[in-house]
Regions:
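Bacterial N-terminal signal peptides
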Residues: 12-23
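A structural boundary/capping signal
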Residues: 27-243
Length: 243
């Protein structure tokens, strides 16, 4: 685990990050969780093995059991649960330099790096009813000048921003994470904000981010194709909200 350090620009970053996430209703219009049919898990087991099937069953049971819990419990549970996934570098796991895995790939292979685990947390929270607009991905720099990705959550304008980090066991607020310096933040809907060296925000089109946003878009498309493949075992019903 890396050691972290303080950066004075983090508070400025937090302010802009809050703006970029935007304001969502404090009363979530949560989607109703509908458990997947058993045929989905059986099909996964046939294709990826019984251990993979067991992992998918277990996480869906956890999601179902905690769907109505308070938001903070969902955040802590998600962070704890997915931080147990072994950290494996992309060249070792995928034989590629920078591969963004889907949550399904991360769970079936049981490994991933910071991007993969952040994406997994995003998917788990969405399945537990957390709205898309409350979540974002922050690309940051650590004390060792390592590039790192975390998931961030902000419920409404008056609430704190929380950071879910695969290197830190606790879900901490932005002001408590003085150890991180932001580079950019983006959301699933394509909103992207670049933070410059002075801590100033510049809004840009998603195309400007180029390769990184391309990887997110590609991972989403693979995830969508994979879900569609298994929908026939789920009575034709979508496996993920807003599919």
């Amino acid at each position: 685990m890396m050691n972290f350090y303080c950066r004075t620009t983090f508070k400025t970053f937090l302010f802009f990050l809050i703006l970029s996430i935007g304001v969502v209703s404090s009363v979530f219009a949560a989607h109703t969780f509908v458990p997947w049919e058993d045929g989905v898990f059986v099909a996964i087991g046939k294709e990826h093995g019984l251990e993979a099937e067991k992992r998918i069953r277990t996480i869906m049971d956890v999601i179902q059991a905690n769907h109505e819990k308070p938001v903070m419990e969902k955040l802590k549970l998600t962070n704890d649960y997915l931080n147990n996934i072994p950290w494996i570098a992309d060249p070792d796991l995928w034989k590629r330099e920078d591969y963004w895995a889907t949550p399904f790939e991360t769970l079936t292979t049981f490994g991933g790096d910071c991007e993969d685990i952040a994406i997994g947390k995003y998917a788990m929270l969405r399945l537990m009813g957390i709205p898309d607009d409350a979540l974002g991905f922050a690309y940051v720099e650590t004390r060792d000048k390592e590039r790192h990705m975390v998931l961030v959550f902000k419920e409404n304008d008056a609430s704190p921003l929380y950071v879910l980090d695969n290197q830190v066991p606790d879900v901490l607020t932005g002001p408590e994470r003085k150890d991180l310096l932001a580079i950019y933040v983006f959301q699933n809907n394509g909103k992207l904000y670049i933070i410059d060296n002075k801590g100033e925000k510049r809004s840009v089109k998603k195309e400007f981010m180029g390769r990184k946003f391309e990887k997110w878009a590609t991972a989403k498309e693979r995830a969508r194709e994979n879900r569609k493949k298994y929908e026939k075992y789920n009575g034709g019903r979508p496996l993920f909200p807003n599919d």
